[in-house]
Every structure is written in structure tokens, then in C-alpha cells.
Amino acid sequence: MTDYSEIATFPRGAKRPAAIDELAAAIESDGGAALAAYQEPLGAHWQIFALIPSAMLQGTPFQRDLSPGHLKRLGEVMKKLRRFTEPVVVVRADGGYWTPNGNHRRATATRLGAKTIPAIVIAEPEVAYQILALNTEKAHNLKDKALEVIRMYRSRLEQSPRAIEKDFAFEFERAHFITLGILYDRTKRFSGAVYAPLLSRVDGFLAKTLREAAEERE
């Protein structure tokens, strides 16, 4: 394996986990640049600050669609500043990279010609499922939240059908988002706001496997 001792490390002199060096090697192999490894200040988790090839970076497959209006406004600001000042959050997945927080910035910078995107690369891929907690770039409306949740739900169902639904309460945030997501997905003109107040009081996470819970909710 390549020696990454030249990469800046914080705390200084700390021994990086093998998984972080492996991630740095993967980033370099993918044509990116691993610039620094550090422990973030809250949980002391190891992360990498890197430049990721824009061609290998995309939003997670289950998050909301890009907003044309937000892209336009963001593009105007970026054109004026000619700077990319906020790194996106990234996990390595499916032979590329997903950003659960920063997809509008990624898309805008790429459209403006950026070949690499500054990123905080997180070693734990499950962080990609914590979109609703992480994503402060653009406020979610009810439909956005519900559709993202049902996409995450179905992804988790495919990966781990025997996992228990209530164990994903943090990721899904509110149980009624699952139910509303099913309805929004089926009926494009569905008005979830009418039912959300009541549904939020009666819907809860189930102590059943995702397969069983999905069948019940469907």
C-alpha cells in the first residue's frame, strides 16, 4: 500500500486507523487528492479532507431532485465569487462517491467547469442515509422529506430486509414520512399536508422487520 505519512494529520502525531489510510489510497487511485486526515471535534471520528473528481461524484440515489431555482441562484453567486467555499460531505459508494449534503453545490460547480470538488470524506457509508439530519443546504418541504424517506426506506429494505424498522428512527426522522412517501410516490398530485397533522400523531415506527413493516404500510 502507498505510504500516506506525508498527508497532514490532526491531532499531530496521532496514529491514523488503517481504514483511513485505505480510504486515502482509494481516493488517490480514483484520481482525487487526499489532503489531510483529522478527527472531527464532536465524536473524534476520523475523516479526510480531499479533492474528489467531479465526474465521480453524485448525489445519493434516494435524495430529493435538484431544484432548478436553487441551482440558478447558486450559480449566480458562484459565478460572482469564483470560489468554492463550502466542502461537500461525501462517502465512497458503488465505485464512486455520493454526497448526502451538498448536491446542489456539486451540480452547480460541475456545470461551471469544476474538475474537482473539495470534500469531507467520511469512512462510514451509513452516513449517506442520514440526509435529513445533515442537509441544511435547502429547507425540505413535506413532499421532499417524505420522498427522500421512502427512497431510503426501500434502499434499506433491499439491503437488510430482516432489520427492524424502529432501529432506523433517526434516519427516517418521523414514521409518518414513510407512509406519506408511499402515497406521494403513487399519486403525483397527492396533498400530504392535509393528512400530515393527524398521521403524525397516530403513525409510529414498527417493531417489525423492514419486509414485514413494508408489507403492512403498503
Predicted segments, located by residue:
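Short, charged/polar connector segments at secondary-structure boundaries
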Residues: 1-120, 163-174, 184-185, 189-192, ...
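Solvent-exposed functional surfaces
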Residues: 4-14, 124, 128-218
